[in-house]
Curated annotation (Swiss-Prot):
SMART domains: Aldolase_II. Its main location: cytoplasm. InterPro entries: Aldolase_class_II_sugar_metab, Aldolase_II/adducin_N, Aldolase_II/adducin_N_sf, Rhamnulose-1-P_Aldolase. It catalyses: L-rhamnulose 1-phosphate = (S)-lactaldehyde + dihydroxyacetone phosphate. Keywords: Cytoplasm, Lyase, Metal-binding, Rhamnose metabolism, Zinc. One of its GO terms (cellular component) is cytosol. One of its GO terms (molecular function) is rhamnulose-1-phosphate aldolase activity. This is Rhamnulose-1-phosphate aldolase. It is found in: Cytoplasm. Pathway: Carbohydrate degradation; L-rhamnose degradation; glycerone phosphate from L-rhamnose: step 3/3.
Amino acid sequence: MQNITDSWFVQGMIKATSDAWLKGWDERNGGNLTLRLDETDIAPFAANFHEKPRYIALSQPMPLLANTPFIVTGSGKFFRNVQLDPAANLGVVKIDSDGAGYHILWGLTHDAVPTSELPAHFLSHCERIKATHGKDRVIMHCHATNLIALTYVLENNTALITRKLWEGSTECLVVFPDGVGILPWMVPGTDEIGQATAQEMQKHSLVLWPFHGVFGSGPTLDETFGLIDTAEKSAEVLVKIYSMGGMKQTITREELVALGKRFGVTPLASAVALY
């Protein structure tokens, strides 16, 4: 019999959560991660499912996600512990046929529940499914240190933060040409912040929560982790630049345009036109 803990999706979640903790992005129970699956991914492991799956209603119906399975991190769970006990810290859930709630098929033992940011994740999944024609499958939220730091010293403006991150490392424009959305500060774990995040996810694969963290979306766990890692590396460079007195020279507008042409991407127009 196949064991679900050996599946590609459980092993992928173990690696992503462990790597994020080692990066320092997910202290204590900070951060959350969800991966949209297909029925064919989970079907071979039906023997591992709970005999009586718990049902939890969603705070608002999400018919676009009807009958869709996900693997999710748990509420109050520490990323550093996922590798030690996947079944206690992760869960496979499946949305019901009308999108009103979900059953916990596997994991989240001892009456654990999915992350408190599940509304933000599911709403963002809906928008990224539409924006990428189903290509994006991962939503990752973490407390990337230097990205958070920048929200204290830069104007919280999409065009400005995007432009500065592009300048912080040449690869950034290629990796996230659609730029970085940013919200006003909001109380986490609410439908309101979930809706605001999803609205930005219509246009951007990265969304900053000022003084809190970042949301990233991508087609795979590796791509999504790499997206956040790239932005965070640029933010680290910028933090060092500002601590050394600021930029003396940088990548110019003309050079950014040339970079986009070379790699066949269309940079966010408002960030290119900023100066």
